[in-house]
Amino acid sequence: MTMEPNSTTSDHILDWLEGSVSFFPSFLDEPCNNSGYIQEYHLWDQYQTDANTGSSPNATNSTTATIVATSATSTTSLEPCGSNNNQPLSDLPKKRNATDESSLKPPQNKNKRIKTRPMNEPENGDAVRKNKKGGAKANGSNCNSGNSKEGRWAEQLLNPCAAAIAGGNVNRVQHLLYVLHELASPTGDPNHRLAAHGLRALTHHLSSSSSSPTSSGTITFASTEPRFFQKSLLKFYEVSPWFSFPNNIANASILQVLAEEANITSRTLHILDIGVSHGVQWPTLLDALSRRSGGPPSVVRLTVVTAENDQNMETPFSKAPPGYNYYPRLLGYAQSININLQINRIENHSLQTLNAQSISASPDEILIVCAQFRLHHLNHNSPDERSEFLKVLRNMEPRGVILSENNTECCCSGCGNFAAGFTRRVEYLWRFLDSTSSAFKGRESDERRVMEGEAAKALTNQREMNEEKEKWCGRMKEAGFAGEVFGEDAVDGGRALLRKYDSNWEMKVEEKNTSVGLWWKGQPVSFCSLWKLDGNDQGGTS
């Protein structure tokens, strides 16, 4: 299926910043900044074509859609907590007024909260810890609840409840569920919200029903209207580096790989997108390609592998709502900056069965794989789908592979019992909720609720099988890849981007400069790594 962009050209992306630059005064002055990440948020407003126009997003089995634009003619502690380690109930937050039994959401006039210290008030008279970056401001939750477990009362209820479930202690389970129900709320500080999401997940686990936990009232990507989904996604990219940072590093890595190739202007750049950006990542890259000193590639092919409906419906951040279609906007923007862009969409196609033929790869093109936050859903036990897929990528002989993943331990049933896995899931969600409180400066917003509801799928999704960075690096090496050192542009650009966010965010360059990590309050969140074919590897095929 072929789609043509709007025939009217638009102003350059820099013109769309008019009236918006004041939001980022210091960042734009940075010598190594990647201003495209600011610009791209305003790109989508330029093309106000309905999100439902163009090709239908409804997937059919192993469907491939081709879309073309041309610049000329447009054809925690991981061990379960025992009861003797639990916080006394007298130390827990004061009981809230009764909540609605069905949704956990309290009435507007009954929204009692725990009285705590102001977010930046020191404990026991200690001085407030200085910001690591002098020019940055720490917003939202900046108390002792980040690096330390102190003050994180929701986990002190959720984790013992999971341990009681695993141990079959019915009385204790009932008691802790009751306390959680009294304290949980979808609004308020991160503890209240974590308690609400955790209570819903535990209830779902105990239920014999196979219905999705997201049907109980939580707002997620799939339940939103396409325009609001787009608005929420762009807002999140503006206020949090959770995804914008790895996307920034990935785009810089693509440019780094491209710079090492010859005859760029007469060749095709083919990007295999196995990610969760839903198009937000690519305007910045297209803009950078249009400004290359030697000119852009003759053709830029973007092959988007969407998440499978049957397998990844509950996978966080991977599925857009029905009707969401960013392709016309992206094609229109590419045309306006003289980039010959082609978009190929592969739907309902399992990652394990991808090959050079299914993505229509050709030997003379520059193939770069961008795999972000999707591969950890592949099984790593028996069968080991994860290692097998990396070998599939190796057999495609890409010029570069960018791997971005959550940097946390696996929480599947094969790597521990229910209590241990649930504790790790709760730890992941705490970091997300705590960081979004800072990102949105503690304000309630529908955009924040959508992102948090989507992240909360990690508590119930059985395909959420993370691995730490070291294990991922080992898998890549076993598959026949060698780590590539990040260039200065990628590292400096990442640091410059991070300066505009809360000072509790931190970037760490690791693994001999072949991995860049994103950390929140001293704890790892994700990593981004760059890989090339290992010249010493003689196998590679399977």
Curated annotation (Swiss-Prot):
Subcellular localization, as worded in the UniProt entry: Nucleus
Induction of synthesis: Induced in roots after inoculation with Mesorhizobium loti. Induced in roots by infection with arbuscular mycorrhizal fungus Rhizophagus irregularis.
Domain GRAS: 145-532
Biased composition (Basic and acidic residues): 92-103
Tissue: Highly expressed in roots.
Gene inactivation effect: Roots of knockout plants form few aborted and non-functional nodules under nitrogen limitation when inoculated with Mesorhizobium loti. Low level of arbuscular mycorrhizal (AM) colonization in roots inoculated with the AM fungus Rhizophagus irregularis.
Region (VHIID): 233-332
Record region (Leucine repeat I (LRI)): 152-214
Keyword Transcription: yes
Highest taxon of source: Eukaryota
Chain ranges for the short sequence motif VHIID as given in the UniProt record: 269-273
Annotated stretches, region: Disordered: 73-150
Keywords: Nodulation, Nucleus, Transcription, Transcription regulation
Alphabetical list of InterPro entries matching this protein: TF_GRAS
Keyword Acetylation: no
Region (SAW), start-end ranges: 455-532
Comp. bias regions, Low complexity: 136-148
Pfam families: GRAS (PF03514)
GO biological process: nodulation
Major localization listed first in the record, in broad terms: nucleus
Region (PFYRE), start-end ranges: 367-452
Residue numbers spanned by region Leucine repeat II (LRII): 333-357
Protein role: Transcriptional regulator essential for Nod-factor-induced gene expression. Acts downstream of calcium spiking and a calcium/calmodulin-dependent protein kinase required for activation of early nodulation gene expression. Acts as a common symbiosis gene that positively contributes to the early steps of the arbuscular mycorrhizal fungus and rhizobial infection processes in roots. Transcription factor involved in the positive regulation of the beta-carotene isomerase D27, which participates in a pathway leading to biosynthesis of strigolactones in roots.
Annotated family: Belongs to the GRAS family.
Name of the protein this chain belongs to: Protein NODULATION SIGNALING PATHWAY 1
Gene that produces this protein: NSP1
